[in-house]
Amino acid sequence: MIAFHMVWSALLASLLLLLLAPSASPVDAFSPPEASLTGGQSLSKRSLFDPSCTGVFDRQLLRRLGRVCDDCFNVFREPNVAMECRSNCYNNPVFRQCMEYLLPAHLHDEYRLAVQMVGK
């Protein structure tokens, strides 16, 4: 029960930080709905990212997915979260749990689609 309250407090604190600094929002939760994750695509410098991501190479998309993992690590401070969240090009249970904890429900489908796009 105490662990739940600690996690809940950490989550609330991170949400408060997001509200205070919307321009630095890692998940762009305050962006308008028409702002899509699937904007322009680049085909250069693929080696900068995980080689297991063999789908569409979109830096902005990969950055947003990676930011979910970074924020999840910052909330829970578990060493394995950062690596497991990115494994299999974000197509794993840890990423899905992080997404559910950190993102508003209306963005879940958009991020699931993004994972499918980069991991094909």
From Swiss-Prot:
Main location: secreted
One GO MF term: neuropeptide hormone activity
Gene3D superfamilies, per the entry: Crustacean CHH/MIH/GIH neurohormone
Signal peptide: 1-27
GO CC annotations on file: extracellular region
Classification via PROSITE patterns: CHH_MIH_GIH
Family annotation (Pfam families): Crust_neurohorm
Key word Disulfide bond present: yes
Keyword Disulfide bond on entry: yes
Disulfide bonds: 53-89, 69-85, 72-98
Positions where Valine amide occurs in the chain: 118
One BP term from GO: neuropeptide signaling pathway
TM helices/strands, residue ranges: none
Known role: Hormone found in the sinus gland of isopods and decapods which controls the blood sugar level. Has a secretagogue action over the amylase released from the midgut gland. May act as a stress hormone and may be involved in the control of molting and reproduction.
Family per record: Belongs to the arthropod CHH/MIH/GIH/VIH hormone family.
Name of the molecule in the record: Crustacean hyperglycemic hormones 2
Organism: Penaeus japonicus
